[in-house]
């Protein structure tokens, strides 16, 4: 049967719409685990919202003065609440990293959405676990327990701060309909600046309780090298 040009056009257009709809449905179906983790993150946020509000002033203070990190550790309740919020922040952090391709090496390009999501969660979960383990193994000598807690746990404070910033950027991007590439670049810059400020505060705490050389070796072994390997794996491979 011979179709007119108009009929052929509308027929092709209809098929294209169907294909796009099926593609969207399949993509959403394949990303099912993302929505599961998102629901878990929202529930945890609602449970911890009062705790988050209570610790925010202390978190802001740690960015202004390094001694505030030690003051935070002096309060067992605040430090415990901060640690719990840091653990709960891992899920939303990984979801943002996955959604905006903040960690997207070339070898992950051909993988499915669910596989990439699990890899991102696995890699950052492993990174945080190894880093925490090494910090407890390679404890600098001649350092008080109070100062040591400040050195180790200042990372938790800045991790929460970084996650909050990334969530705010993601929310603002959704409101103002920003391009994904611009959002990704903004998040990378915020991550870099937060990391630099974190290292400065950690160096200041180390300098207050041990020699500069000891503190430098400590940072190289447990901060600079692991983070460098993570960044290199994302850029080169």
Kindly give the residue locations of the regions a language model identified.
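Cytosolic juxtamembrane amphipathic/interface segments immediately preceding
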Residues: 18-26, 67-81
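Long, highly hydrophobic alpha-helical transmembrane signal-anchor segments
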Residues: 1-37, 91-111
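Interfacial/capping segments of alpha-helical transmembrane domains
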Residues: 1-9, 51-63
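Perimembrane loop-to-helix junctions flanking transmembrane segments
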Residues: 60-73, 108-112
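Alpha-helical transmembrane segments with an aromatic anchor "belt"
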Residues: 102-175
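Terminal transmembrane helical module of multi-pass membrane proteins
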Residues: 165-237
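Hydrophobic alpha-helical membrane-embedded segments
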Residues: 27-57, 126, 130
């Amino acid at each position: 049967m011979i179709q007119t040009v108009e009929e052929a056009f509308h027929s092709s257009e209809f098929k294209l719409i169907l294909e796009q709809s099926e593609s969207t449905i399949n993509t959403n179906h394949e990303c099912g685990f993302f929505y599961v983790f998102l629901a878990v993150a929202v529930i945890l946020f609602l449970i911890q919202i009062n705790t988050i509000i209570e610790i925010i002033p202390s978190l802001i203070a740690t960015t202004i003065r390094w001694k505030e990190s030690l003051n935070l550790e002096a309060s067992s309740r605040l430090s415990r609440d901060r640690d719990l919020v840091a653990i709960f922040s891992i899920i939303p952090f990984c979801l943002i990293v996955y959604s905006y391709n903040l960690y997207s090496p070339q070898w992950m390009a051909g993988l499915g959405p669910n596989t990439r999501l699990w890899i991102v969660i696995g890699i950052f979960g492993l990174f945080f676990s190894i880093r925490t383990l090494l910090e407890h193994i390679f404890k600098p000598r001649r350092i008080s327990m109070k100062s040591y807690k400040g050195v180790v746990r200042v990372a938790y404070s800045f991790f929460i701060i970084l996650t909050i910033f990334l969530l705010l950027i993601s929310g603002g991007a959704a409101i103002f309909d920003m391009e994904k590439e611009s959002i990704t670049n903004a998040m990378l810059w915020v991550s870099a600046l937060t990391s630099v400020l974190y290292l400065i505060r950690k160096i200041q705490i180390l300098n207050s309780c041990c020699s500069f050389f000891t503190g430098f070796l400590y940072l190289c072994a447990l901060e600079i090298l692991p983070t460098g390997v993570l960044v290199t794996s994302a850029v080169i491979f």
